[in-house]
Structure formats: C-alpha cells, structure tokens
Amino acid sequence: MSRIGRKPIPVPQGVEVKVEGTTVTVKGPKGSLTREFHPDMKITFDGSQILVERPSDEKEHKALHGLTRTLINNMIVGVTNGYQKSLELVGVGYRAAKQGRKLVLTVGYSHPVEMDPPEGIEIEVPAQNQIIVKGIDKELVGNFAATIRAVREPEPYKGKGIKYTDEVIRRKAGKTGGKGKK
C-alpha cells in the first residue's frame, strides 16, 4: 500500500497558500482554487510545505489521508502549470468549431451539438478534428472532457467517435460474409 499521505507537499515560489481549519485556498500565477476537506484531516502549512496528518490508522482515515494530500497537490499543480486534455474526432464529416465561448460539434446527428463550458474551463480547437480542454481545476477539466467524449463515444468496429488523443480503441472484427438464409 502506498504511503502517499505522509509525503509533504512542496509549495513552489509564487504560490500563496492559506489554510483555515479544513478549507485550503491556493493562489498562483494561473488563478486561485479553494476546497473544503474532511474535518478529521489536520492540514498544516509552514511556509515552504504542506503536511496532512490523520487522527488514526483506521481504514477510512488512511484512504482520506492519501486523497486529501493528492487533492491539495493537484490544486498547486493546477495554479502553477494548469491541466489540459486533448480529444480528437474520428469519422467522415465529424468536426468541432468554436462559436464565441460555445463548442459546436457535428458528429453525425441530425443536429449540431452545442456545449457550454463551465466557468474556469477554456476550449481550443486547433484543427476541425481536434479539441483541447484547458483549466486549473483537474476535476473540472476531466469531467468536461468526458462530457464531450460522451456525446459520441468511439465505436469498436470503425473507431468512429470522439476519443482522447492518447486513447487506444479496442477494435472488433465485423460479421463474416457467410451464406445467407434461404
């Protein structure tokens, strides 16, 4: 079992951290994030690093310990570097376009699908078959990218649909052309 919760979280230069009870606020060059954590977790900040401590070795507290540490680390990485997910559209006539803040997808339905990104999410469309979702909140970026993918998930026969750029689609063989019924 990993002991990730015990590792201190280094705070880089230019990042401001405020810990008030169970609420942690992180401000950095890309923006600021605030999150409420479980009341059992003790979070301390000594100027250069953040430490997360658990009250006991119960299973629930062990799980929360690692989770809390990782969430705080994700906040720090988000406000310094940000997060991004890239998707690609595979299929004839499948394309994405940006209209103002909206994302418009043409993916084989009788109508174009319009999507409004949540606050704090930025969308780029470098090519008509590529979408890049950017933001400082890892959870929001992942959720919105998954929502886009869910509009037309890749199918296993031809691979048509919206997929993550690094995703590998498991393909299936089609029906073999045998003799038909008479």
From Swiss-Prot:
Keyword Lipid biosynthesis carried by entry: no
Function: This protein binds to the 23S rRNA, and is important in its secondary structure. It is located near the subunit interface in the base of the L7/L12 stalk, and near the tRNA binding site of the peptidyltransferase center.
Family statement drawn from the similarity comment of this UniProt entry: Belongs to the universal ribosomal protein uL6 family.
GO biological process: cytoplasmic translation
Keywords: Ribonucleoprotein, Ribosomal protein, RNA-binding, rRNA-binding
GO cellular component term of the entry, any: cytosolic large ribosomal subunit
Name under which the protein is recorded: Large ribosomal subunit protein uL6
